[in-house]
Amino acid sequence: MMKLTRRELLTAGLPALAATVLPPNTALAAAMPPAVSPLATGKAWPARRKQIERAWLDLLGDFPTEIPPLKPSMKQASHAGGITRYHVSFQAEPDDRVTAWLLVPDSAKRKRAPAIINIHSTTWGAGKDSTAGLAGRRPQDPPTAPEIGRASGLELARHGYVTLCIDLLTDGERIKPGERVMDTRGFYRKHPEWSIVGKNIWDVMRSVDFLQTLDFVESKQIGVIGWSLGGHLALFAGAFDPRIAATISNGGVLDWHRKVDAWSRKPDDWKPWVQGDPERSNPELERRFGFKTNSGPYIYIKKFRPYIEDQAKRIPTDFDELMMLVAPRPLLIISSEWEFYSHKIIPKCLEAAKVYAGWRDVEGLPSVMAARQQRAGYDKTLAYYEFNNKLTPDRIAAQISEIGAGDAFSWFSFPGGHAYPPVARQMTFAWYDRWLGHVPSLT
């Protein structure tokens, strides 16, 4: 069987990205080319985008070049409330499988539905069970209260979306024997030049591969969402997999903190945990959650450590540019008011919004306007403005194209703490319904 590289798979038949180039991020002023006129859209943005992507991959590590067969497993676990729950797994690497709950509303069995990859937050062993509404932070804990919103995968399925709730490596079923939850030491012994963030992105890519094999899924209408750790990863996944049609990052850390415990912890040693070792826990987490976390050292991006050790060292990229990599596909940033302040989200969103608002179609490149015309509901736009304004379809398209992709990017804050409250979940449903062309239906 012919083997394709990840890049070959992702770029085959997919739209090339073309947008106006922005003034360079001040941190990259010395490295990036000068800004150009929006009229030069198609000529300059692809090169700029490659520079941003390369800067991130230099930190994250490159993705594997060969893709193993999926070898999926799918077994029904339950059917209740109009939703069938399947336990699924599929190959991520030759010696590693992603485990997940697949939630399928009855309506999807009669008509193909969009699908959402739902990524859990930091848990202490519950992993995918938390987003599927089966457990709290730990496997033995009951599901959290609805107002907290941890079971967002179940809610999306109740809204009519096929939902894939995955386990991230080091959590849920993917805690290796002899290791603690959130212990990445084994991963870095195996992949010293990669990062757990890069690995998690890869696993989401493989999740897209899996969903596209299902005959009840609209294969071009796949979204990704997560909260907290999952929200952080959702933005990365949307940036690096152009098959993801709409992204929501909720409560994810979107700012660099040059602290040892934030991005690149250095463990006391690289030996695996063995039975009888003293517990690793955090008094502050014990105070907040009421139990010993007993977690391992979670090292997000190993190659970020030089920027912690040398506070004056220039960080080569930032999260506004990660948002730009998602463009022109729809992206929604959700966080609490405090997180908008502490992560400096507004300035980053304003920079990314320039890419979206300045997006223009260029002859010879795939059209953003064509994507609008292919989404459900565009026929209603034509019918309304042809009848009320006597406009031709070409004129309607010409006028709408002037907004670029500006309406495909937005941000939303809510009061309170680090959570996923009902108002944020309502925004989630509205965003996906709009951009994935979904009419809610469970049965």
Task: Give, region by region, the residue ranges found by the protein language model.
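C-terminal catalytic histidine-bearing segment of alpha/beta-hydrolase fold enzymes
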Residues: 362-365, 369-443
